């Protein structure tokens, strides 16, 4: 005796958004639904938000201005516990976006004291809302922002002594 189940799904509406409908670029590398209810898109041309009705681009082409140049070619976006967006680009740079003030901060100076090679390979949030950063030289950092966006970093692992400087591979398996 065999049993079979059939499930019916209600009619679903799927919307397609393109550059013609307000998205900054048709190439979307990543998305994030923020705590604020906005959907954030990492596109080839930069950061874009969607509030459910309209898009907003955060780049210099649309009259947006930030002290630091807005990132382009975004590969990954994560949100920390204070609502700041951490943005990793394809060229392995890292930015912090303050949604309240609509401004970017290049995180170069914050990372360089912990790593000789400040290229960021991976970003990920922790369960408590901090952000883990893995650099190209395999250093692991834990980053935290306060309510005003001030960044504090702690080095969890320094692989520099274990990295072959000629090909950036680990000499020993330290992870």
Put a short name on every predicted segment.
Residues 1-175:
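Carboxylate-rich, polar loop motifs that coordinate divalent cations or form catalytic acidic clusters
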């Amino acid at each position: 005796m065999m049993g079979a189940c059939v499930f019916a799904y209600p009619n679903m509406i799927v919307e397609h958004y393109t550059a013609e409908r307000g998205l900054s670029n048709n190439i979307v590398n990543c998305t994030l639904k923020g705590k604020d209810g906005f959907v954030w898109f990492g596109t080839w041309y930069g950061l874009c938000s969607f509030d459910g009705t309209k898009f907003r681009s955060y780049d210099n082409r649309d009259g947006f201005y930030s002290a630091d140049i807005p990132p382009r070619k975004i590969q990954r976006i994560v949100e920390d516990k204070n609502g700041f967006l951490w943005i990793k680009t394809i060229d392995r740079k890292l930015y912090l976006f303050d949604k309240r003030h609509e401004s970017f901060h290049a995180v170069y100076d914050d990372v360089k004291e912990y790593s000789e090679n400040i290229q960021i390979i991976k970003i990920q949030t922790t369960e408590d809302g901090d952000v883990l950063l893995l650099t190209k030289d395999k250093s692991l950092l834990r980053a935290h922002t306060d309510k005003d966006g001030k960044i504090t970093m702690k080095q969890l692992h320094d692989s520099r002594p274990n990295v072959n400087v000629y090909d950036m591979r680990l000499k020993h398996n330290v992870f």
